[in-house]
A protein has these predicted regions:
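N-terminal intrinsically disordered, cationic/polar leader segments
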Residues: 1-7, 11-134
Length: 134
């Protein structure tokens, strides 16, 4: 399954692609926002950060059984530093634990593939692509 997202800013595109991952797994119209989870990711370069971000979101969903409705970034550092430190982000996810009776589960996602990952910038903002293994 292919995911793609665009945004005027990089953080907007990262938000949209993560919400796309969650929406591919559970119908977001059935998810409330009574609980939160924190997700942190880091990577050397934007494709590595994107992969780590989606893997962490997938972990929260598949292992912790959490369905996400919305998210916001507390930290979004994507400017390379002189010391070569990894890019990093920290987000607060809003949603709730998956309830098979209330939530319409759409797909079981096994992995985020490194193949097909891309982060591109253009005059209208950013475009992200990722492949999910079902």
């Amino acid at each position: 399954m292919e995911l793609s997202a665009t945004g005027a800013t990089l953080s907007e595109a990262f938000t949209r692609i993560a919400l796309g991952l969650f929406a591919a797994a559970v119908d977001p119209d059935t998810v409330g926002d009574s609980d939160t989870r924190e997700v942190r990711a880091h990577g050397v370069g934007l494709p590595a950060l994107l992969h780590a971000w989606l893997q962490e979101c997938l972990y929260v969903h598949e292992v912790e059984g959490f369905a996400c409705r919305s998210l916001e970034f507390a930290v979004f550092e994507t400017a390379p530093s002189a010391g070569g430190e990894a890019l990093r982000l920290h987000a607060i996810l809003r949603g709730e634990e998956i309830d098979p009776i209330r939530h319409r589960v759409l797909a079981a996602i096994r992995n985020v593939s490194r193949d097909g990952l891309s982060v591109e910038s253009g005059s209208k903002g950013f475009s992200l692509r990722a492949s999910l293994e079902l």
